[in-house]
């Protein structure tokens, strides 16, 4: 069972009584056929639920009102099978607070050249019914998605499925609770921000709990639970000699297991699905949570270090969006560069906390090594390299008057040399279009040093995320040129200033 099983998307057909009972009967019949086929064959993440025809203002408004108050409804897919005068939709759309997609399709794929008549034309009017619906959306300044294509087309299926992921993610975000264990890293700017504005814009709440509250739960964990979790470590990872039974760091592994169990219990009891820690606020914990955080991220929790609640929330959101897709999603940080003409590289990592969902297939190494930052006992961590291939890194920043999402398309590459003295998980990539352009654009746009790294999602997913939340997006990819990028930032400043 996944998070998508908790939601459904309503399929709404727009028409009108002008065409008579027989036409409306055929519209209903077609709608039932399409919905059944999509649910059976399209591999959509959510179930489509067909609602009664929308043929009058009252019917349409009732559907929109019901959608708002049904917690299982993640959004609406609207098909204008016939012409549906858009003034009928104004009241409903004005109150609708769920994501909306127009599926611009028709029942038949090919025109029946020899038999087409006006009855056929009146029944199959998506071509201009969809335009009428589009006008009222533009007139009302209502953000909605449009997918054009025949309902049997696999590309249309893929695009609807991707939108469904966004719709479910938005509903989950409205319920998301982010727990900050301690505060932000002292004097750091980008990890701070307006938590009230974030809740107004996205819906997630951010609050702080004292590390002592967590420590109390951690200390309540019994040896039996710890032993069971250690057995799981033994079967899932390759343990270094120091971390095995009778190894000199075995107790550190047990303490890491205690912290993991305590953190998970605390998060479950509080209904949290994202959290932060900071190495400056660990009072009562024997080690910086490394292994615990890595494993919790792999289970779907959002996380970021140094109190960075925006990145923690974004990671959770992107974890939900990518549920069931191939490839992983992780907290990440641009750490250091390899400058080589024509082969500039970025080595990404963090002190400990990189999610194993992005790891290569072989078992990660479980090790305990010294960590100078934090002043605690040596922490346990998983060490691995990352899968290769196309990926993205994304950052959500608070500009005071608005939020900006930055996305850099990257190409993850194999590490050309072993890293015997680097005791942390890492990813190596080439930034698009090149490191100088990507880094300068990122810096000029104010992108954070913390990011969410994903093999599972792509630029189109993040564009949809920005659209569905009505926030600015700045894209850095192979098409980026710095003069045009700077111009876009200036234009956005004017646009969002006027929009306020």
Swiss-Prot record:
GO terms for molecular function: L-arabinose isomerase activity; manganese ion binding. The keyword Manganese applies. It comes from the Bacteria. Belongs to the arabinose isomerase family. This is L-arabinose isomerase. GO terms for biological process: L-arabinose catabolic process to xylulose 5-phosphate. InterPro entries: Ara_Isoase_C, AraA_central, AraA_N, AraA_N_sf, Fuc/Ara_isomerase_C, Fucose_isomerase_N/cen_sf, Lara_isomerase. Mn(2+) binds at residues 306, 333, 350, 450. Signal peptide: none annotated. Transmembrane segments: none annotated. It comes from Salmonella paratyphi B (strain ATCC BAA-1250 / SPB7).
